[in-house]
Every structure is written in C-alpha cells, then in structure tokens.
Amino acid sequence: MTAYHFVGIKGTGMSALAQVLHDLGYTVQGSDVEKWFFTQKALEERGIPVLPFSKDNIRPGYTVIAGNAFPDTHEEIEAARQLGVPVIRYHRFLGQLAGKFTSIAVTGSHGKTTTTGLLAHVMQGAHPTSYLIGDGTGKGEPGSKYFVFEACEYRRHFLSYFPDYAIMTNIDFDHPDYFANVDDVFSAFQQMANQVKKAIVACGDDPYLPNIQAKVPILFYGFGEENDFQARNIVKTTEGMAFDVFVRNTFFASFAIPRFGTHNVLNALAVIALCHYEGVDAGTIAKRLQTFQGVKRRFSEKTVGRQVLIDDYAHHPREITATLEAARQKYPGREVVAIFQPHTYTRTQTFLREFAESLLQADHVYLCDIFGSAREHEGKLTIRDLQAQIPRSQLLEEQNVAVLKQHQDAVLVFMGAGDIQKFQQAYERAVLSA
C-alpha cells in the first residue's frame, strides 16, 4: 500500500484530506512552513508527521499530493518527478476519492463550510459517513457509504468532481483575482451542475441559482413559496433559530438549530432537503440539527472577563453582514465591535465600498493591515483606503490590542481569512497579563 506525502499539509483542505486517508488506514505524512496553523491540532492528535519542507522528504513508493498554492518548481514536487514518484494535485485526488462513495459535494460562494459540517453531522446520525470540511476537519469512516465534502469554486477546482449530489448555497462575485464578474462565476457553477449524477439541491431565493440547468432533478429551497422546500414561521431567539419546513406546500416537520442568523436557516434547509431526498427520517434530522456544535472559525466564541470574543472566517461583505447580524441576535443590547483584517489586495480593492457598508453595522470598527495571499504580497492599495471609508474607525496592530479593553461588556468580533487569530491571541494575552 502506498504512503501519501502532502506538500502543504497545513492547508485547510489538505489537512482534512490527510485525516480522511489516515482514518481509512493509509500511511500519511506531510510538510509545510514552520509557522503554527490551527489545522495542526487534528494532525498532531492523530500522530500524522508534519515535517519542514525538504526534498529529502520524498522517497520511492510514495504518492505526493500537492497543495494548489505550490508551483511545480517546489523542491519537493521536483524531487518527486526526478524519482518517478506520482504527483497529484489536491482537487484531482479528492475527485478520485469521492468517486468511491455516494458523494455529496457542497459548494457556493458563502456558507459551504458550515453547510458541509452540518450535513456531515446529520448524515452520521443515519448512516456511516466520511467527510471533508473546509475548516481543516476530516474523518474517514471505514465502511462508510457516504462521503460529504466541501467543493471550492476558486479557479474552477470543483470541476475535478463528478458527485452524485451537489448542494449549491448561492452564487456571488468573489475571488476577483480569478473570476471576471458574477457571470463568470455563474458559468463555473453551470459547468459543475452538468457533472452531477443524481440530483442538485439549490437555494431558490438566490438571484442566479434558479437559472441553473441540469440533466438531473434540481430541488430548490428557501423562504419563497415557489421553493420545493420552504422555511416558514421563523423564530429568532438568543438560543438560535426555530422554523417549520413545508415540502411543496405540505407541512413536513418543525426544526431548531443552535446557530444564529437567517443564513443558518438556509444552510439547515439545504441539509434537510438533501436528507429528505435520501430517505432520512424527520426525527433523526431534527435531533442531529439540535446537537450541531458548528465548525472551526465560524462564529467560534469564548468569554474573556466580561467580554465575548468571536472568531469568524468572514472575508466578504456579505459574510461580514451575516456574522454581525448573528452577533446582535445572540447578544441583544450589547456593544458589537468589529475587528477586521481584509484578505487579499484584489478583493479589498474590488469591494472597498461594500466592505465599508457592511462594517458600519458594528458599533465600532478596528482595521488590521491587509493580508496578502500566497500569490500576492503587496498592492497599491493600503488599509488606510478602507479606513477613509469608515468614519471613526481605527487601525489595530498586535502591539496595541489593549485598546480593545475599553469596550467593557462588548462582543468583539474578529473577522478575516488571513491570520486575524494572532490579534485575538495577542489581546487574550494582554488581558491575562493585566
């Protein structure tokens, strides 16, 4: 049996895939930069070796799975080619693995990680299920029939997948370094729809998804009456969301989720529709929905003194709006403070005005310097361009995080897809050392 070596094992998808293969009985190791990432914990708990990059890591008999951020000129990929060791990109390998199961791909511009996690959690209550979530969490369940996995549209990587089912949460313009406009994004999703084998579950309230065409049935979900699966009688509380589901205008069941914001009702509705199609009973779905603990870096909360600190991956204006809405629902009457680190110069430039508008929904805004991706390290834009759009916003650096102490009893919402966590960690240290 081959051993798998992951080039860039700390990436969220790569880490999750390594966990899946390890659980299924394969020998797995990987390499990456030495900087600590939150994805390491699950690897370390399984005893999966994480090595510094070196061409000496590659040996005959291995199969190399390469992260998409690493070029063919990377020393380990070059070493593999010289040794005749097979090299396969992450998304291509994932496509091959998914083909061995009844596969359910979860995709969409927003909400796919939470929806993948929620679907995996609910399906496990009915059948043995393997899963790969984009928060760095993966599980390979020996003997499982189903494989639930997150499918990213970036660079059309999800076109490597030919799933039995696909959930499509929404279509929005994002990744402006790759997609030209929202029509370009739509065309990618249309291509994906053509590759689905059994059925598609799509949000009918989305402006674009109702225009998707496919050779398989499309089940629409949402709040509108024209949807196959409709949520009605929505109740928001400080404990979460409750709602009734009607299937083609006939009452199906009542559900509750310990998550916040109307976007999470839609995420749950997608899961309910897919499970209904696969014959999972309403009682099992309801029970599992109520025990969902969330996914990493999606509204992850902790209390420090009299403040609540929330860590969230939100890095698009629509996601910021949803996260701040959720914070206000759970903590009504408390000051909501946004601490935001923009992710990539191209995205910040493209959505500068929209970022400002979404952040203005907080009571106070702090901005961290722009985080450039692995593909871009600097741009003409600076964080001050965004600051100029947000009255009374302040710049935040790691060494001056103590300024956040003035917001007593507040909800501090740290948002971003880069290394925003280091600001939260620095603040927690500042509070503890006071």
Swiss-Prot record:
Quote the EC number: 6.3.2.8
Q: Which catalysed reactions does the entry list for this protein?
A: UDP-N-acetyl-alpha-D-muramate + L-alanine + ATP = UDP-N-acetyl-alpha-D-muramoyl-L-alanine + ADP + phosphate + H(+)
- Main subcellular localisation: cytoplasm
Binding-site positions, ATP: G108, S109, H110, G111, K112, T113, T114
**NCBIfam families in the record, alphabetically?**
murC
Residue ranges the record marks as coiled coil: none
Keyword tags: ATP-binding, Cell cycle, Cell division, Cell shape, Cell wall biogenesis/degradation, Cytoplasm, Ligase, Nucleotide-binding, Peptidoglycan synthesis
- Protein role: Cell wall formation.
Q: What class of enzyme is it?
A: ligase
Note whether Acyltransferase occurs among the keywords.
no
Location relative to the cell? Cytoplasm
Q: Name one Pfam family in it.
A: Mur_ligase_C
Output this protein's name: UDP-N-acetylmuramate--L-alanine ligase
According to its UniProt entry, the protein's GO biological process terms are:
cell division; cell wall organization; peptidoglycan biosynthetic process; regulation of cell shape
Give the CC-aspect GO terms.
cytoplasm
Species the sequence originates in: Geobacillus kaustophilus (strain HTA426)
Q: Name one GO molecular function term.
A: UDP-N-acetylmuramate-L-alanine ligase activity
